[in-house]
Amino acid sequence: MSLATLDSMGGASTGSVTVTEQLNFWAGRRVGGRNSEHAEPVFEPATGRVLCQMVPCGAEEVDEAIMSAHAAYVQWSKKSGTERARVMLEAARIIRERREKIAKLEVINNGKSITEALVDIDVAWQCIEYYAGVAGTLAGQHFQLPGGAFAYTRREPLGVCVGIGAWNYPFQIAACKSAPALACGNAMVFKPSPFTPVTAVILAEIYKEAGVPDGLFCVVQGGAETGSLLCNHPKVAKVSFTGSVPTGKKVMEMSAKGVKQVTLELGGKSPLIIFKDCDLENAVKGALMANFLTQGQVCCNGTRVFVHKDILPQFLEEVVKRTKAIAVGDPLLDSTRMGALITKPHLEKVLGFVRQAKKEGGRVLCGGEPFVPSDPKLKGGYFMSPCILDNCRDDMTCVKEEIFGPVMSVLPFDTEEEVIRRANNTTFGLASGVFTRDISRAHRVAASLEAGTCFINNYNISPVEVPFGGYKMSGFGRENGQVTIEYYSQLKTVVVETGDVENYF
């Protein structure tokens, strides 16, 4: 969908859009897939109808994209940080100007509510704007050495970076991976999820309109095979991947063969701990934020909700009431708070977790069933009612495994020491949360939790200035914040002698 077509999105509605434009982008233009016999249908989650066809890129196309990116990198890396910042600020401005139309297209491809999608697009331009500000500040250090000698360091780009995105935040992930890469002087080849191929190419066109060299941000479509070609290409210097743990392991293994730098943002089964001295109203709202954004399809969601036994009845009463009131339906309506899950197989997988929880002794307090909206055009959509599971134990499947859907597992606890031990009893470590009025306890628990992020008296708030990433099997490296510059650049040390060389021999 070209930028010109994007401008016609103002009047688009659910079920009314079909994408026929080419979805790859390199050398400054859209490129069609050459392996049309391998085309895969992409479905609109809210209706179940075919939105477009995704044609995966093969070895020849991947090579063309990477060589295009490398040529652009040679030009871009020679620009000053201020010059790069100027172009990036223009890209942020264009996104901001077209946020509503981009958000609509994101909803049609992804299924989340328009209210959430607008926030996602805002985060995208804010991230590009933030790293534009960082670009002009990149600098090394000076070291005075004995005898008038000195040394200095140069912070240099890596080269061609690969970004592999997930389907829950398609446009935002493309922006948040490319922004620090471009700020440091790199180029990026980005592969979206095959379920959400539509909006990353819009970002590529926006970068081109803003003035980046042709090829600086390329988009290649495809699944696992295309991803493998990217990770194994000798011209690629770094891979940044967002997705599941099993796929992340494969990305790491493939990248290791070429000694490429890797950032992995993987899955989670994050704990949210609610102490009895909390503000219960805020704790309930936090639990909803921790479980039901993007239909529960968020890697850092706090899906293990530990509630002190003394307030468990009050918490359950209020959280069930609020959950039943969540408006599920047409994601393009402003009143909708939960849209459709990404695919029919994924919907069935999530519903299967609920069935398994019941077999293992869990009690469904609300939801956990297929939901059919009243609008006839949504009959084939992938909707379900948000679910609260009570009577959960730490050894249950729904508590141990990442569900990636709108399912909250509630677990009672008694003491602080007990709940910290139970919260850390997982192979994941992406996020965590604490609700308490006791400031000492809040910081004590935050220090004890084995997770890359800990939210205190809130949840799922991730400003672009703040680093985000995991512990343990949730990955390594960071996205967002100043520290991410270190993951998209390398240091060169230059040692200068101003006198004579010592005659050792």
Curated annotation (Swiss-Prot):
What is the annotated tissue distribution of the protein whose record heads this document? Constitutively expressed in all organs tested: brain, eye, gill, GI, heart, liver, kidney, muscle, skin, testis and ovary.
Enzyme Commission designation:
1.2.1.47, 1.2.1.3
Q: Does the keyword Magnesium apply?
A: no
Q: Which residues form the active site?
A: E265, C299
Its GO biological process annotations read: aldehyde metabolic process; carnitine biosynthetic process; protein homotetramerization
Sorted alphabetically, the keyword list is: Cytoplasm, NAD, Oxidoreductase
Per its record, the protein catalyses: 4-(trimethylamino)butanal + NAD(+) + H2O = 4-(trimethylamino)butanoate + NADH + 2 H(+); an aldehyde + NAD(+) + H2O = a carboxylate + NADH + 2 H(+)
The record's subcellular location field reads: Cytoplasm, Cytosol
- Keyword Nucleotidyltransferase: yes or no? no
Single annotated GO MF: aminobutyraldehyde dehydrogenase (NAD+) activity
Q: Which InterPro entries match?
A: Ald_DH/histidinol_DH, Ald_DH_C, Ald_DH_CS_CYS, Ald_DH_CS_GLU, Ald_DH_N, Aldehyde_DH_dom
Pathway(s) served:
Amine and polyamine biosynthesis; carnitine biosynthesis
EC category name? oxidoreductase
- Please explain the role this protein plays, according to its UniProt record: Converts gamma-trimethylaminobutyraldehyde into gamma-butyrobetaine with high efficiency (in vitro). Can catalyze the irreversible oxidation of a broad range of aldehydes to the corresponding acids in an NAD-dependent reaction, but with low efficiency.
> What is known about its subunit structure?
Homotetramer.
Per the record, the similarity remark reads: Belongs to the aldehyde dehydrogenase family.
Protein name as it appears in the record: 4-trimethylaminobutyraldehyde dehydrogenase
Can you name the source organism?
Oryzias latipes
